[in-house]
Protein backbone atom coordinates (compact mmCIF):
# COMPACT_ATOMS: atom_id res chain seq x y z
CA UNK A 1 0.00 0.00 0.00
CA UNK A 2 2.81 2.39 0.77
CA UNK A 3 4.39 1.88 -2.62
CA UNK A 4 1.11 2.40 -4.40
CA UNK A 5 0.40 5.71 -2.67
CA UNK A 6 3.77 7.14 -3.62
CA UNK A 7 3.25 6.03 -7.19
CA UNK A 8 -0.10 7.76 -7.30
CA UNK A 9 1.40 10.96 -5.92
CA UNK A 10 4.12 10.92 -8.55
CA UNK A 11 1.57 10.38 -11.29
CA UNK A 12 -0.52 13.28 -10.06
CA UNK A 13 2.54 15.53 -10.01
CA UNK A 14 3.42 14.45 -13.52
CA UNK A 15 -0.12 15.24 -14.71
CA UNK A 16 0.11 18.70 -13.16
CA UNK A 17 3.48 19.31 -14.78
CA UNK A 18 2.15 18.17 -18.14
CA UNK A 19 -0.76 20.58 -17.87
CA UNK A 20 1.50 23.46 -16.83
CA UNK A 21 4.21 22.89 -19.44
CA UNK A 22 2.11 21.79 -22.42
CA UNK A 23 3.19 24.88 -24.43
CA UNK A 24 6.81 24.96 -23.25
CA UNK A 25 9.75 23.32 -25.01
CA UNK A 26 10.73 21.63 -21.72
CA UNK A 27 7.83 19.17 -22.00
CA UNK A 28 9.85 16.85 -24.18
CA UNK A 29 12.56 16.78 -21.54
CA UNK A 30 10.09 16.16 -18.72
CA UNK A 31 8.27 13.24 -20.31
CA UNK A 32 11.31 10.96 -20.52
CA UNK A 33 12.13 11.84 -16.93
CA UNK A 34 8.69 10.79 -15.75
CA UNK A 35 8.78 7.56 -17.71
CA UNK A 36 12.22 6.74 -16.39
CA UNK A 37 10.99 7.45 -12.86
CA UNK A 38 8.14 4.96 -13.34
CA UNK A 39 10.52 2.34 -14.64
CA UNK A 40 12.83 2.87 -11.71
CA UNK A 41 9.92 2.52 -9.30
CA UNK A 42 8.83 -0.69 -10.96
CA UNK A 43 12.35 -2.06 -10.95
CA UNK A 44 13.04 -1.05 -7.34
CA UNK A 45 9.87 -1.57 -5.38
CA UNK A 46 11.79 -1.71 -2.18
CA UNK A 47 13.47 1.71 -2.46
CA UNK A 48 12.89 4.19 0.29
CA UNK A 49 10.06 6.69 -0.02
CA UNK A 50 12.31 9.63 0.88
CA UNK A 51 14.52 9.08 -2.16
CA UNK A 52 11.51 8.82 -4.41
CA UNK A 53 10.05 11.99 -3.03
CA UNK A 54 13.32 13.79 -3.51
CA UNK A 55 13.47 12.67 -7.12
CA UNK A 56 9.88 13.73 -7.69
CA UNK A 57 10.57 17.14 -6.15
CA UNK A 58 13.64 17.60 -8.33
CA UNK A 59 11.66 16.65 -11.42
CA UNK A 60 8.89 19.08 -10.46
CA UNK A 61 11.37 21.88 -9.90
CA UNK A 62 13.00 21.17 -13.27
CA UNK A 63 9.62 21.24 -15.01
CA UNK A 64 8.67 24.45 -13.31
CA UNK A 65 12.01 25.98 -14.21
CA UNK A 66 11.53 24.92 -17.84
CA UNK A 67 8.05 26.41 -17.94
CA UNK A 68 9.31 29.63 -16.38
CA UNK A 69 12.21 29.74 -18.83
CA UNK A 70 9.84 29.20 -21.74
CA UNK A 71 7.54 31.96 -20.51
CA UNK A 72 10.47 34.29 -19.99
CA UNK A 73 11.71 33.45 -23.50
CA UNK A 74 8.32 34.28 -24.98
CA UNK A 75 7.97 37.57 -23.14
CA UNK A 76 10.92 39.35 -24.83
CA UNK A 77 9.61 38.31 -28.23
CA UNK A 78 6.17 39.68 -27.40
CA UNK A 79 7.68 42.87 -26.03
CA UNK A 80 9.80 43.28 -29.14
CA UNK A 81 6.72 42.81 -31.33
CA UNK A 82 4.79 45.40 -29.34
CA UNK A 83 7.68 47.85 -29.53
CA UNK A 84 7.93 47.27 -33.27
CA UNK A 85 4.21 47.93 -33.69
CA UNK A 86 4.49 51.04 -31.57
CA UNK A 87 7.35 52.26 -33.74
CA UNK A 88 5.36 51.65 -36.91
CA UNK A 89 2.32 53.56 -35.73
CA UNK A 90 4.13 56.85 -34.94
CA UNK A 91 6.01 56.69 -38.24
CA UNK A 92 2.74 56.39 -40.15
CA UNK A 93 1.20 59.18 -38.11
CA UNK A 94 4.22 61.35 -38.78
CA UNK A 95 4.01 60.65 -42.51
CA UNK A 96 0.32 61.62 -42.55
CA UNK A 97 0.99 64.78 -40.54
CA UNK A 98 3.89 65.70 -42.82
CA UNK A 99 1.70 65.25 -45.90
CA UNK A 100 -1.01 67.45 -44.38
CA UNK A 101 1.54 70.10 -43.43
CA UNK A 102 3.02 70.02 -46.93
CA UNK A 103 -0.39 70.50 -48.55
CA UNK A 104 -1.21 73.37 -46.19
CA UNK A 105 2.14 75.00 -46.92
CA UNK A 106 1.61 74.75 -50.68
CA UNK A 107 -1.86 76.29 -50.40
CA UNK A 108 -0.51 79.08 -48.20
CA UNK A 109 2.30 79.84 -50.66
CA UNK A 110 -0.12 79.91 -53.60
CA UNK A 111 -2.43 82.28 -51.77
CA UNK A 112 0.45 84.58 -50.84
CA UNK A 113 1.70 84.70 -54.42
CA UNK A 114 -1.79 85.41 -55.74
CA UNK A 115 -2.24 88.28 -53.30
CA UNK A 116 1.14 89.74 -54.22
CA UNK A 117 0.34 89.53 -57.95
CA UNK A 118 -3.00 91.26 -57.37
CA UNK A 119 -1.30 94.03 -55.42
CA UNK A 120 1.28 94.55 -58.17
CA UNK A 121 -1.42 94.72 -60.84
CA UNK A 122 -3.47 97.13 -58.75
CA UNK A 123 -0.47 99.41 -58.21
CA UNK A 124 0.38 99.29 -61.91
CA UNK A 125 -3.12 100.35 -62.90
CA UNK A 126 -3.09 103.14 -60.32
CA UNK A 127 0.21 104.45 -61.67
CA UNK A 128 -1.04 104.26 -65.26
CA UNK A 129 -4.23 106.15 -64.44
CA UNK A 130 -2.27 108.79 -62.54
CA UNK A 131 0.09 109.28 -65.51
CA UNK A 132 -2.82 109.59 -67.96
CA UNK A 133 -4.55 112.11 -65.70
CA UNK A 134 -1.37 114.19 -65.57
CA UNK A 135 -1.14 114.02 -69.38
CA UNK A 136 -4.76 115.13 -69.79
CA UNK A 137 -4.06 118.18 -67.64
CA UNK A 138 -1.45 119.55 -70.08
CA UNK A 139 -3.36 118.73 -73.28
CA UNK A 140 -5.63 121.50 -74.63
CA UNK A 141 -9.08 120.04 -75.10
CA UNK A 142 -12.20 121.77 -76.34
CA UNK A 143 -14.38 121.78 -74.37
CA UNK A 144 -12.18 121.78 -71.31
CA UNK A 145 -14.31 119.27 -69.42
CA UNK A 146 -14.12 116.70 -72.23
CA UNK A 147 -13.43 113.20 -70.99
CA UNK A 148 -10.86 111.36 -73.08
CA UNK A 149 -10.28 107.65 -73.02
CA UNK A 150 -6.82 106.20 -72.69
CA UNK A 151 -6.32 105.60 -76.41
CA UNK A 152 -7.76 109.04 -77.28
CA UNK A 153 -5.43 110.68 -74.78
CA UNK A 154 -2.39 108.96 -76.29
CA UNK A 155 -3.38 109.81 -79.87
CA UNK A 156 -4.09 113.42 -79.05
CA UNK A 157 -0.78 113.71 -77.17
CA UNK A 158 0.99 112.30 -80.25
CA UNK A 159 -0.67 114.85 -82.56
CA UNK A 160 -0.05 117.71 -80.17
CA UNK A 161 3.64 116.89 -79.83
CA UNK A 162 3.91 116.61 -83.61
CA UNK A 163 2.29 120.05 -84.06
CA UNK A 164 4.67 121.65 -81.55
CA UNK A 165 7.65 120.03 -83.27
CA UNK A 166 6.57 121.32 -86.68
CA UNK A 167 6.06 124.78 -85.22
CA UNK A 168 9.61 124.91 -83.89
CA UNK A 169 11.07 123.57 -87.12
CA UNK A 170 9.23 126.00 -89.38
CA UNK A 171 9.92 128.92 -87.07
CA UNK A 172 13.64 128.21 -87.32
CA UNK A 173 13.38 127.82 -91.10
CA UNK A 174 11.36 130.98 -91.84
CA UNK A 175 13.09 133.22 -89.35
CA UNK A 176 10.97 136.11 -88.10
CA UNK A 177 8.30 135.89 -90.78
CA UNK A 178 6.33 133.05 -89.28
CA UNK A 179 4.15 135.00 -86.90
CA UNK A 180 1.03 133.10 -87.86
CA UNK A 181 2.53 129.59 -87.71
CA UNK A 182 1.96 128.78 -84.05
CA UNK A 183 -1.69 129.72 -84.33
CA UNK A 184 -2.15 127.60 -87.45
CA UNK A 185 -0.46 124.57 -85.93
CA UNK A 186 -2.33 124.97 -82.69
CA UNK A 187 -5.63 125.14 -84.52
CA UNK A 188 -4.67 122.03 -86.45
CA UNK A 189 -3.78 120.22 -83.23
CA UNK A 190 -7.19 121.17 -81.92
CA UNK A 191 -8.72 119.66 -85.04
CA UNK A 192 -6.83 116.46 -84.34
CA UNK A 193 -8.12 116.27 -80.77
CA UNK A 194 -11.25 114.22 -80.06
CA UNK A 195 -14.25 116.54 -79.94
CA UNK A 196 -12.26 119.51 -81.18
CA UNK A 197 -12.77 118.85 -84.87
CA UNK A 198 -16.53 119.30 -84.69
CA UNK A 199 -16.18 122.55 -82.75
CA UNK A 200 -13.63 123.92 -85.18
CA UNK A 201 -15.64 122.89 -88.23
CA UNK A 202 -18.78 124.49 -86.83
CA UNK A 203 -16.94 127.79 -86.34
CA UNK A 204 -15.33 127.82 -89.79
CA UNK A 205 -16.37 126.07 -92.97
CA UNK A 206 -12.82 125.13 -94.00
CA UNK A 207 -11.71 121.53 -93.48
CA UNK A 208 -8.11 120.46 -92.88
CA UNK A 209 -6.10 119.66 -95.96
CA UNK A 210 -5.28 115.98 -96.61
CA UNK A 211 -1.52 116.61 -96.58
CA UNK A 212 0.82 119.04 -94.92
CA UNK A 213 2.06 121.74 -97.34
CA UNK A 214 3.83 125.02 -96.89
CA UNK A 215 5.20 127.67 -99.21
CA UNK A 216 7.62 130.55 -98.94
CA UNK A 217 7.18 133.64 -101.11
CA UNK A 218 8.85 137.02 -101.31
CA UNK A 219 5.59 138.81 -101.94
CA UNK A 220 4.20 140.82 -99.06
CA UNK A 221 0.68 139.54 -99.75
CA UNK A 222 -0.60 137.84 -96.64
CA UNK A 223 -2.09 134.39 -96.79
CA UNK A 224 -5.00 132.91 -94.94
CA UNK A 225 -2.84 131.72 -92.06
CA UNK A 226 -0.46 134.74 -91.77
CA UNK A 227 -1.46 137.75 -89.72
CA UNK A 228 -2.33 140.97 -91.60
CA UNK A 229 0.15 143.13 -89.67
CA UNK A 230 3.21 141.14 -90.79
CA UNK A 231 5.90 143.47 -92.21
CA UNK A 232 8.38 140.85 -93.41
CA UNK A 233 8.89 140.59 -97.20
CA UNK A 234 8.74 136.84 -96.82
CA UNK A 235 5.68 134.94 -95.73
CA UNK A 236 5.29 131.30 -94.78
CA UNK A 237 2.02 129.52 -94.84
CA UNK A 238 1.37 126.10 -93.36
CA UNK A 239 -1.71 123.99 -93.48
CA UNK A 240 -0.78 120.80 -91.64
CA UNK A 241 -3.08 117.87 -91.55
CA UNK A 242 -3.22 114.74 -89.49
CA UNK A 243 0.08 112.86 -89.32
CA UNK A 244 -1.55 109.98 -91.10
CA UNK A 245 -4.90 108.90 -92.41
CA UNK A 246 -5.04 105.44 -90.86
CA UNK A 247 -3.98 103.88 -87.60
CA UNK A 248 -1.16 101.91 -89.24
CA UNK A 249 0.37 105.00 -90.82
CA UNK A 250 -0.41 106.95 -87.69
CA UNK A 251 1.76 104.82 -85.43
CA UNK A 252 4.65 104.15 -87.82
CA UNK A 253 8.00 105.31 -86.40
CA UNK A 254 10.00 107.94 -88.31
CA UNK A 255 12.89 106.84 -90.51
CA UNK A 256 16.34 106.88 -88.90
CA UNK A 257 17.72 109.59 -91.23
CA UNK A 258 15.19 112.17 -90.04
CA UNK A 259 14.84 113.97 -86.75
CA UNK A 260 14.23 111.58 -83.89
CA UNK A 261 11.12 113.33 -82.55
CA UNK A 262 9.57 114.65 -85.77
CA UNK A 263 7.55 112.10 -87.80
CA UNK A 264 8.27 111.83 -91.49
CA UNK A 265 5.53 113.44 -93.56
CA UNK A 266 5.24 114.19 -97.30
CA UNK A 267 5.84 117.94 -97.65
CA UNK A 268 5.36 119.81 -100.92
CA UNK A 269 7.36 123.01 -101.24
CA UNK A 270 6.46 125.78 -103.66
CA UNK A 271 9.00 128.56 -103.57
CA UNK A 272 8.41 131.53 -105.91
Curated annotation (Swiss-Prot):
Transcriptional regulator. Involved in neuronal differentiation. Activates transcription by binding to the E box (5'-CANNTG-3'). Gene3D superfamilies: Helix-loop-helix DNA-binding domain. This is Neurogenin-2. PROSITE patterns: BHLH. GO terms for cellular component: chromatin; nucleus. It is found in: Nucleus. Residues 30-69, 197-264 are annotated as: Disordered. It comes from Homo sapiens.
Amino acid sequence: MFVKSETLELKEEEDVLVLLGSASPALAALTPLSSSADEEEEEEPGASGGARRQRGAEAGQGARGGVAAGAEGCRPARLLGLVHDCKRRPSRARAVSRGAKTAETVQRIKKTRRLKANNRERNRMHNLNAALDALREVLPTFPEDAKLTKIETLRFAHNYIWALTETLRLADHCGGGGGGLPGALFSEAVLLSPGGASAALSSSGDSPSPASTWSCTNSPAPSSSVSSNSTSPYSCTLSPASPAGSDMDYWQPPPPDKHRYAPHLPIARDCI
